[in-house]
């Protein structure tokens, strides 16, 4: 199995500087230490095997046994790529983000992995599922593969002026020099070039005019890509915005 692992302690704070001095103010995100997780127990449809799957969400510690759509709990601003889909009445899940022990606390393990589904044990569909966490919400249940961005509400309101983002991380990338394309609707193909991992932060100023038109202007950007595995954890990595 081709797999890319990205172990991430969290995005627990933004480092900011105020005034003319260099005093650093650390502003944490709620649940950003990743020590609390919600476990969801989902029962998939019998037509695809009827398995019971676990999905994990960042938020106040709780276990939910239900196929109900999930919404953020306890004021958690976090969402991830663990989702429940319901297409033509068939319930299917994907789990590519997991809580994992790190020292006295927890971290998030994000995997890029193959997810397969068999219908009546005959039709085998395999797709690549990439693990990710982000600030915002997912509109469950997922009802199709068209326009995936419409299923996300990316970003949260942030009124401070951050100068940098800081987090701990650990990476393990696949050794292959090629990537695999597998959408489930066409044959699996190989694409030249190594895979990479990205952390992306966009700051936008948004406003609305009296006619109800919403505008946005980007005022800050941070993009960091990782193309090599790390030798253990990198602590307090700080990237300017």
Predicted regions and their residues:
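Bacterial Sec-dependent N-terminal signal peptides
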Residues: 1-26
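Functionally constrained cores in energy, signaling, and assembly domains
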Residues: 13, 163, 171
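Residue-level detector of intrinsically disordered, flexible termini
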Residues: 14-16, 78, 173, 177
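Aromatic (Trp/Tyr/Phe) and Gly/Pro-enriched flexible surface segments
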Residues: 20-162, 166, 192-206, 210-241
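Extended, low-complexity, turn-rich repeat/linker tracts enriched in Gly/Pro/Ser/Thr and Asp/Glu
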Residues: 171-178, 189-194, 207-208
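A short secondary-structure junction signal
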Residues: 177-181, 212-213
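Intrinsically disordered, low-complexity domain-flanking/linker segments in eukaryotic proteins
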Residues: 182-187
